[in-house]
Curated annotation (Swiss-Prot):
Textual note on the cofactor: Binds 2 Mg(2+) ion per subunit.
Matching NCBIfam families: ruvC
EC number(s) on file: 3.1.21.10
Binding site for Mg(2+) 2: E72
Statement: the UniProt record of this protein carries the keyword Membrane: no
Full protein name: Crossover junction endodeoxyribonuclease RuvC
Organism expressing this protein natively: Methylocella silvestris (strain DSM 15510 / CIP 108128 / LMG 27833 / NCIMB 13906 / BL2)
InterPro entries recorded: RNaseH-like_sf, RNaseH_sf, X-over_junc_endoDNase_Mg_BS, X-over_junc_endoDNase_RuvC
Principal subcellular localisation of the protein: cytoplasm
EC class: hydrolase
Required cofactor names: Mg(2+)
Active-site residues annotated for this sequence: D12, E72, D144
């Protein structure tokens, strides 16, 4: 199995604050690289806010050179206007890494919680605590950044599982 390090950016979409976290995965070993949030101004037009998020994410991607991206699927609340705006911010979270040539994976919030904490209904504080445990050098200063690191951790762990399953299935095909 290939143990080459892969750099992953996790993204937690949001219109005000879009969290991002970059880790490196080598086999089952995870290393913290950086994390933070890209912000948009609340008084600006929607187009200006989306543009600010897009430019901010592209800057992070250019600076930190991730090889793959993972984005949290958004929870749709009961306010359709808010859901639509969040969906547009999520579009930025998907398009920015894709434009940079990165493969982009998507994960449901409960799968991220289940993978990182072991409970699909974990609270934000539990997620932040487990992120700190799994990445001791991490300094997530916001819940958005901690959530983004959790997205990256989930991608690293599920990516490794998929690679193992693929190698096992190709071995069984070769032995037939």
């Amino acid at each position: 199995m290939n143990r080459a390090a892969i750099r992953i950016i996790g993204i937690d979409p949001g219109l005000r604050n879009m969290g991002w976290g970059v880790i490196e995965a080598s086999g089952s070993r995870l290393s913290f690289i950086a994390c933070g949030s890209v912000h948009s101004q609340a008084g600006s037009s929607l187009a200006e806010r989306l543009c600010a998020l897009h430019e901010g994410l592209l800057g992070v991607i250019a600076d930190l050179s991730p090889m793959e991206a993972a984005v949290e699927e958004t929870f749709v609340n009961c306010d359709p206007q808010s859901a639509l705006k969040l969906g547009q911010a999520r579009g930025v979270a998907l398009v920015a890494p894709a434009l940079a040539g990165l493969p982009v994976a998507e994960y449901a919030a409960n799968l991220i919680k289940k993978t990182v904490v072991g409970n699909g209904h974990a609270e934000k504080a539990q997620i932040a605590m487990m992120v700190k445990f799994l990445l001791p050098m991490s300094e997530a200063k916001s819940a958005d950044a901690a959530d983004a690191l959790a997205v990256a951790i989930t991608h690293a762990q599920l990516r490794a599982s998929r690679a193992l399953l693929k190698s096992v299935s190709s071995m069984s095909v070769q032995t037939r």
